[in-house]
Amino acid sequence: MKIHVFLFVLFFFLVPIATRVKCAVKDTYSCFIMRGKCRHECHDFEKPIGFCTKLNANCYM
């Protein structure tokens, strides 16, 4: 019974956290590695990015 509870907690609580960390890593790559391609406002086909402190950018081309 304890194994079922453990798997339930693992699946429903820890998996979404891992997904958010994965997105944060992707945003960090977009902001810091592709530094010259970030801008403060989104234009036509640019993708919005998340938290970016160094550039304070919202989009990348």
From Swiss-Prot:
Major site of localization recorded for this protein: secreted
Stretch forming the signal peptide: 1-23
The UniProt record lists the keyword Phosphoprotein: no
MF term (GO), any: CCR6 chemokine receptor binding
InterPro entries reported in the protein's UniProt record: Beta_defensin_dom (IPR025933)
Residue pairs linked by disulfide bridges in the UniProt entry: 31-59, 38-52
Keywords: Antibiotic, Antimicrobial, Defensin, Disulfide bond, Secreted, Signal
Family: Belongs to the beta-defensin family.
Function: Has antibacterial activity.
Entry-linked PANTHER family: BETA-DEFENSIN (PTHR20515), BETA-DEFENSIN 133 (PTHR20515:SF17)
Protein name per Swiss-Prot or TrEMBL: Beta-defensin 133
Protein source organism: Homo sapiens
Name of the gene: DEFB133
